[in-house]
């Protein structure tokens, strides 16, 4: 905020779903993202909220099944964005496979996008930034 950006892009939540820093509920994760958006809005910064990318497993956290949590978090973020007239960038729909994970060709580990994945994401985000 102190750098006074004109726009902030919020793409967050997957590491929290993976419980990388300990257990978190979907509501806790959503509230953290919403708090960031509210701080930006209060400082006249344009907010763009991005969907969490699809994931149906974590190679480093075998016991966690994230697909339903990702969908639930994305729904909360989409509804918040709509109600608050914020841009919502839907990467999920463009990148999901039939088993609710990241399309194999778009990432190496099923979580993080590769170059092909970023090439899918780029025009979607550019459209939101330019609107």
Say what each PLM segment does.
Residues 1-131:
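Alpha-helical cap/lid subdomain in secreted, periplasmic
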